[in-house]
Amino acid sequence: MAVPKRRMSRSNTRSRRSQWKATATELVNVTVGGQNHKVPRRLLKAARLGLIDLDRR
């Protein structure tokens, strides 16, 4: 495992960590039972197979 050669200051650590940003998942249109729904791409197959409840909002 990599070990830092020198101690990193708190401000440097926090400014480095602040660069990590969460992104919203892109929604894809899927037609189930004649109705259009928007679901994340990773849930597309489950939505088509009826494994998830799409009417719950």
From Swiss-Prot:
- One GO molecular function term? structural constituent of ribosome
Kindly indicate where the leader peptide sits in this chain.
none
Q: What keywords are annotated for this sequence in UniProt?
A: Ribonucleoprotein, Ribosomal protein
Instruction: State one Pfam family annotation.
Output: Ribosomal_L32p
Gene Ontology BP annotations: translation
Q: What residue spans carry the region label Disordered?
A: 1-21
UniProt entry tagged with the keyword Endoplasmic reticulum = no
In the record, the note on similarity to other proteins reads:
Belongs to the bacterial ribosomal protein bL32 family.
HAMAP family tied to this protein: Ribosomal_bL32 (MF_00340)
Q: Which NCBIfam families match?
A: rpmF_bact (TIGR01031)
Please identify the protein, giving its name as recorded: Large ribosomal subunit protein bL32
